[in-house]
């Protein structure tokens, strides 16, 4: 392997850093709605009282609040499904740049919702920033995967998740009552998203377009070669160009890959199934139930200062994402995902025990904090970062946009289901709500063990070739045999 293949150049750092500002936006808007729940609900009540002359009913308030949380995911579903419309027409970098218009519109709507006495403005703003984040969850892993050398693809791909968790942590800190999570400043808390949008608009014009897009989609070999030299910090980019040209030749032999074709073709059916299930394993693990409703969970657990415990979980979240960043290229994607799922299942059982015995044993509140922190830590070992970038690894340039759209749509749909339903399910099941997530985590562990290949150290074309070979005779092979060409020997 060439020394340049592991070189982290200034231009590569700029490209990845500029892109993951979008990831930070996603994380911020996921976490920002949690801490100021009570003051925003009071705004809803006052607005209702001003309009209709009576206080809002508890059932209506619960529905409006759940909608405010979950409409973000509806926007994300629409945005994620639209990824392919933009990246193939405008390119990866320009698509990220254009989408900041949505962030500015959303910031205005949410920032002026209190002044306009309109909770509809807030909900619409949440929907629009959801569309932005849905697009971002497709654009960023795709762009980062395509500009990164093979040896750094996993580590740099994890930066998308790091951007998300840093965004969540910033939202939790800004959401403190003493900072912006109060009656006067909550509109600013929701609209501060214009700052990273502005910063991304400044940085992205200096970032290169994806060399794979330039060569394979646009057939601009000279531009692709020039970009590669800057990204790799070397004049010899022969190996990268050869690999891209081989992928381009393979793409020309294939017909245009639509979303339906992903499910019809034997060569794509297995990787798209893996991509979708890995996305579901991220969202249906219960992690967003913890993020969206962590403050109220800590309150129920008897924690005196629940918002600080929530911030503690955000710090754990960030720290273990950094750990994953350094081990993903050594341990491999599959191994880390399995460890994460198993650890989360164990912590979910602990959480259930702690919440169930809280009234009899007050000290169980401490166990609930340990369980939540452990749950978050194991999430960031595998199920947090890996599903985002492994989708881009499982597909070659042709089917990649369609595959990322399908995987992203699956992610956001399950995100919406959890965001909309968790409060109701929690009211129904009480302390046993996390048993549901435990069962799902065990099922995802079994699927990952038998079906998910190791992609560490493999080029995009090598991975795609493994699936093409497997697709030709799937019925005659066990899962282990099917994925042997993809590097089962490199698993830890």
UniProtKB/Swiss-Prot annotation:
InterPro entries (alphabetical): Glu_transpt_1, GLUT, MFS_dom, MFS_sugar_transport-like, MFS_trans_sf, Sugar/inositol_transpt, Sugar_transporter_CS
Regulation: The uptake of glucose is inhibited by cytochalasin B. Glucose uptake is increased in response to phorbol ester 12-O-tetradecanoylphorbol-13-acetate (TPA) treatment: TPA-induced glucose uptake requires phosphorylation at Ser-226.
Gene Ontology MF term list: D-glucose transmembrane transporter activity; dehydroascorbic acid transmembrane transporter activity; fucose transmembrane transporter activity; identical protein binding; long-chain fatty acid transmembrane transporter activity
Annotated segments matching region Disordered: 468-492
Gene Ontology cellular component list: apical plasma membrane; basolateral plasma membrane; cortical actin cytoskeleton; cytosol; female germ cell nucleus; female pronucleus; glucose transporter complex; Golgi membrane
Phosphoserine modification, residue list: 226, 465, 490
Binding site for D-glucose: 161, 282-283, 288, 317, 380, 388
Lipid bilayer topology: Multi-pass membrane protein
Gene3D superfamilies: MFS general substrate transporter like domains
Main location: membrane
Modified residues (N-acetylmethionine): 1
Family: Belongs to the major facilitator superfamily. Sugar transporter (TC 2.A.1.1) family. Glucose transporter subfamily.
Protein name: Solute carrier family 2, facilitated glucose transporter member 1
Protein source organism: Sus scrofa (Pig)
């Amino acid at each position: 392997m060439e020394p340049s293949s592991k070189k982290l150049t200034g231009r590569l750092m700029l490209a990845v850093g500029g892109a993951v500002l979008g990831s930070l936006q996603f994380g911020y808007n996921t976490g920002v709605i949690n801490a100021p729940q009570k003051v925003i609900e009071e705004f809803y009540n006052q607005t209702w009282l001003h309009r209709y002359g009576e206080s809002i009913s508890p059932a209506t308030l619960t529905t409006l609040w759940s909608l405010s949380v979950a409409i973000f995911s509806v926007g994300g579903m629409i945005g994620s499904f639209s990824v392919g419309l933009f990246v193939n027409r405008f390119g990866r970098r320009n698509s990220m740049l254009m989408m900041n218009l949505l962030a500015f519109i959303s910031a205005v709507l949410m920032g002026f919702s209190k002044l306009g006495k309109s909770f509809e403005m807030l909900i619409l703003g949440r929907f629009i920033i959801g569309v932005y984040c849905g697009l971002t969850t497709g654009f960023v892993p795709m762009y980062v995967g395509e500009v990164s050398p093979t040896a750094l693809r996993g580590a740099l791909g994890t930066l998308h998740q790091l951007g998300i968790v840093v965004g969540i942590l910033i939202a939790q800190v800004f959401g403190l009552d003493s900072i912006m999570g109060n009656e006067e400043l909550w509109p600013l808390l929701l609209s501060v998203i214009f700052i990273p949008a502005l910063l991304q608009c400044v940085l992205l014009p200096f970032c290169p377009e994806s060399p794979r897009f330039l060569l394979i989609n646009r057939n601009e070999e000279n531009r692709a070669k020039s970009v590669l030299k800057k990204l790799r910090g070397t004049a010899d980019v022969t190996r990268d160009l050869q690999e891209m040209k081989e992928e381009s030749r393979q793409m020309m032999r294939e017909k245009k890959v639509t979303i339906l074709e992903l499910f019809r073709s034997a060569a794509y059916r297995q990787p798209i199934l893996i991509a979708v299930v890995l996305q579901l394993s991220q969202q249906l693990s219960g992690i967003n139930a913890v993020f969206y409703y962590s403050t109220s969970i800590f309150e129920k657990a008897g924690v005196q200062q629940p918002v600080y415990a929530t911030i503690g979980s955000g710090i754990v979240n960030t720290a273990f994402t950094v750990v994953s960043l350094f081990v993903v290229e050594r341990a491999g994607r599959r191994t880390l995902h399995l460890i994460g799922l198993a650890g989360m299942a164990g912590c979910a059982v602990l959480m259930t025990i702690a919440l169930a015995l809280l009234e009899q044993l007050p000290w169980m509140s401490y166990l609930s904090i340990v369980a939540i922190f452990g749950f978050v830590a194991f999430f960031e070992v595998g199920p947090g970062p890996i599903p985002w970038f492994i989708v881009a690894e499982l597909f070659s340039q042709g089917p990649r946009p369609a595959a990322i759209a399908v995987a992203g749509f699956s992610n956001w749909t399950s995100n919406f289901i959890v965001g909309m339903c968790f409060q109701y399910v929690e009211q129904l099941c009480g302390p046993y709500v996390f048993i549901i997530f435990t069962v799902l985590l065990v099922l995802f562990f079994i699927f990952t063990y038998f079906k998910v290949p190791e992609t560490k150290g493999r080029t995009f074309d090598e991975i795609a070739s493994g699936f093409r070979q497997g697709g030709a005779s799937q019925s005659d092979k066990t899962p282990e045999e099917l994925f042997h060409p993809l590097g089962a020997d490199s698993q830890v």
